[in-house]
Amino acid sequence: MVLESISKIIKIQLPAYLKKLPLPETIGGFARLTVSEWLRLLPLLGILALLGYLTIRPFLPKKKKQRDSLINLKIQKENPKVVNEIDIEDLRTPNVCYCRCWRSKTFPVCDKSHIKHNELTGDNVGPLILKKKTL
């Protein structure tokens, strides 16, 4: 039953559909087609576009999955976790900026290396700013 239906579609209905399509003789003939003729061509053009895409898809470049990159590339890599302790009472200057991007040459103090890091990666990391409270 199913094979008979498929056979009827392929042998009878598909050729009849293709014969009724308003395919022009020349490329310039496409410019003279009316809106209703274009609408009759849409299913065929859609199927041809889908088949074309499925044919070239294996050759298209694959999108690489973005994986998280390491933040700390070189500072105290021998330690499993880098922790710096600073007593707030020991602040001598009114403001101190500490690095959070791990790119600072003066780590743990920020040297504004995060600006270049943010431009390159689109990240939004910034320093930790400690302010001495004035009474």
From Swiss-Prot:
Cell compartment(s), UniProt: Endoplasmic reticulum membrane; Mitochondrion outer membrane
Cytoplasmic topology ranges: 61-135
One MF annotation (Gene Ontology) recorded for this entry: protein homodimerization activity
Record's bilayer topology term: Single-pass membrane protein
Origin species: Danio rerio (Zebrafish)
UniProt cross-references to InterPro entries, sorted A to Z: CISD1/2 (IPR045131), FeS-contain_CDGSH-typ (IPR018967), FeS-contain_mitoNEET_N (IPR019610), MitoNEET_CISD (IPR042216)
Cofactor note: Binds 1 [2Fe-2S] cluster.
Name of the protein in question: CDGSH iron-sulfur domain-containing protein 2
Sorted UniProt keywords: 2Fe-2S, Autophagy, Endoplasmic reticulum, Iron, Iron-sulfur, Membrane, Metal-binding, Mitochondrion, Mitochondrion outer membrane, Transmembrane, Transmembrane helix
Gene3D superfamilies from the UniProt entry: CDGSH iron-sulfur domain, mitoNEET-type
Pfam family, one: zf-CDGSH
GO biological process: autophagy of mitochondrion; regulation of autophagy
Function of the protein: Regulator of autophagy that contributes to antagonize becn1-mediated cellular autophagy at the endoplasmic reticulum. Participates in the interaction of bcl2 with becn1 and is required for bcl2-mediated depression of endoplasmic reticulum Ca(2+) stores during autophagy.
Family of this protein: Belongs to the CISD protein family. CISD2 subfamily.
Cofactor: [2Fe-2S] cluster
Main location: endoplasmic reticulum
Disulfide bonds: none
Transmembrane residue ranges: 38-60
GO terms under cellular component: endoplasmic reticulum membrane; mitochondrial outer membrane
Subunit structure: Homodimer.
Residues that, per the record, bind [2Fe-2S] cluster: C99, C101, C110, H114
Gene encoding the protein: cisd2
